[in-house]
């Protein structure tokens, strides 16, 4: 179906589309992913979380989910910047060989790191029952929300009660 040459040609363009998609997500969700005191409490109690105990008054996203968000954004920015530097024949001639070599190493590191983040994200989603539905279909049951994200559950319920008045 495809050739290595075609993959090499398409790779940078697919990367730009991927980056643009994540930037849209960034502007949509950044304010939900700001780290607060409750997140620090969550992180300090990671051992309890690993054995499926709920800790803290978690909002829409827990500390782990926020870390995935920020890591994805940071690694995608690194991929974009390094990718532009190594993008032949368009931009690479503007940079020295040492800069291109550094960009290649940075690009490889950021790609592997992002893949690891995505794998951890998928594993965690499989680990916590009901999370795959949230990721794939975009909704969760009220009992799931109440158990895993109690502050967010209360906020949504308050909005529903106000809108029904």
List PLM regions with ranges.
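Membrane-embedded alpha-helical bundles that constitute the cytochrome b-like, heme-associated redox core
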Residues: 1-165
